Amino acid sequence: MTMYATMTTLALTSLIPPILGALINPNKKNSYPHYVKSIIASTFIISLFPTTMFMCLDQETIISNWHWATTQTTQLSLSFKLDYFSMTFIPVALFVTWSIMEFSLWYMDSDPNINQFFKYLLIFLITMLILVTANNLFQLFIGWEGVGIMSFLLISWWYARTDANTAAIQAILYNRIGDIGFVLALAWFLLHSNSWDPQQMILLSTNTDLTPLLGFLLAAAGKSAQLGLHPWLPSAMEGPTPVSALLHSSTMVVAGIFLLIRFYPLAENNPLIQTLTLCLGAITTLFAAVCALTQNDIKKIVAFSTSSQLGLMMVTIGINQPHLAFLHICTHAFFKAMLFMCSGSIIHNLNNEQDIRKMGGLLKTMPLTSTSLTIGSLALAGMPFLTGFYSKDLIIETANMSYTNAWALSITLIATSLTSAYSTRMILLTLTGQPRFPTLTNINENNPTLLNPIKRLTIGSLFAGFLITNNILPMSTPQVTIPLYLKLTALGVTSLGLLTALDLNYLTSKLKMKSPLYTFHFSNMLGFYPNIMHRSIPYLGLLTSQNLPLLLLDLTWLEKLLPKTISQYQISASITTSTQKGMIKLYFLSFFFPLILTLLLIT
């Protein structure tokens, strides 16, 4: 075992004592959240050393010591893979989680169960690190299900709210659909490869192995909220803001993308899977960007921006560039966590107001939050030399140089322009203009537990992209050899979106209210997908379920077959077989008519 492998194992093992302490002593002291935050900060600092050593040595390591189970055909062991993906992702995840933990000290200060909240966040992080470092498909599945169940517990944290419970159930149901694909791939590889080790799976795979790849794609679509399985992502905003920040930056939603990145050698020579991934990602990134344009909830705007960026990562995998997709995961984590934390700061200071139409003028009252929100939005839009630029620019350049994706490239460029548009709209409505919130609102952002994490992530949003791209292997960004007009494409579409948003804001600032267009309803109602899937189809199912028993059981069984039918048959049979009516008095009276007639005739 190499030195950096030992140090990485030590760093990750240090996350376990807080969990064990919480299990042994449930009645924890008030210092438990600070203890967890300090542990994660220390783990982040320790993890920098093995990551630096890995960059210098460029030597992958697999740790496999403990055998779980052995059958007649398969040996299942606990195995960790420390390669480029895991060694780069671990410090990023720890840094972002450290900032979110410190932010939670301020945001969740009045929550009576804050100790349990921090324990859940820590388990959430550990399950994601298990997923990232797993060198075994079953072990990866444990991390996969771990982030799923922890997201359910954290989204429904405020369990007294009906919307939070509904959102949590929605998240777990949509992820169960994706898990069907994962279990299908698990069973297929065990049947055909007799192993869950990625090395053996890749060695024995052929280009015709379509079934497990479709399973992986379905799993990634469910976990990373691609079109069709996306409604749980904006609904997850019902959870606390620190949960949204951790969920969208470095844990659950990128797990699906990471699954495809980890097993990209299986799909890189399969054109059908590449095409499906490319098309799914392109449609998702455009649909999410269109939906974000008309949202008024600040957290949902950021949530749809996450969905759009996940679609962009899928596009990158679809053009066979998994390393670029991973780079975008790492850069995206910094500014996305910061955007959610800035949103949480604004919401908390405005007494839980999330409608951007009721904000405005926050630039002067909340200067640090406003500055960080602007930097994060510009990084999201791909502004040059911010963190997001280093990955988005390379993705668009690579897509430009690919000759098989003109349709997907066009959609991706449109979505990139829309990203700039809704980011600018959020900045203008939230930070500029006249204040539209109650005048007695007490705004205060002087708490260090609020300022320090936002400052750290702001620095990350400024410089992390430069540091990561200049320290990955190869040690520097390759020289670009494409024409100038293609190189300027990313900047061009970003500028186009910015100008579009400014122009729309200027044109519509003093207009009278008109009835919205159908396109506005399409965007604002999320493409009518929730109404169709969550209202119309369940209503149709309930109506059908009601009518079938009513018609089949009540009407047919009761009226056509048994009691009423028997009585009808008896009445019909009695009428048919006899003319007797049972009228005894009438029968006796009929005997007197002939007698009376006879007497009359005689006389």
From Swiss-Prot:
Enzyme Commission code(s) on record: 7.1.1.2
Domain of life the protein comes from: Eukaryota
Coiled coil: none
Keyword Transcription attributed: no
MF (Gene Ontology): NADH dehydrogenase (ubiquinone) activity
Primary subcellular site in the record, as a coarse category: mitochondrion
Membrane protein topology class: Multi-pass membrane protein
Signal peptide (residue range): none
Keywords per UniProt: Electron transport, Membrane, Mitochondrion, Mitochondrion inner membrane, NAD, Respiratory chain, Translocase, Transmembrane, Transmembrane helix, Transport, Ubiquinone
Membrane-spanning intervals of the chain: 4-24, 38-58, 87-107, 122-142, 144-160, 171-191, 211-233, 241-261, 272-292, 301-320, 325-347, 370-390, 405-422, 457-477, 482-502, 582-602
UniProt-annotated location(s): Mitochondrion inner membrane
GO biological processes: electron transport coupled proton transport; mitochondrial electron transport, NADH to ubiquinone; mitochondrial respiratory chain complex I assembly
Listed PANTHER family: NADH-UBIQUINONE OXIDOREDUCTASE CHAIN 5 (PTHR42829:SF2)
Assembly description: Core subunit of respiratory chain NADH dehydrogenase (Complex I) which is composed of 45 different subunits.
Role summary: Core subunit of the mitochondrial membrane respiratory chain NADH dehydrogenase (Complex I) which catalyzes electron transfer from NADH through the respiratory chain, using ubiquinone as an electron acceptor. Essential for the catalytic activity and assembly of complex I.
Family indicated by similarity: Belongs to the complex I subunit 5 family.
Name listed for the protein in its UniProt record: NADH-ubiquinone oxidoreductase chain 5
Gene that this polypeptide is encoded by: MT-ND5
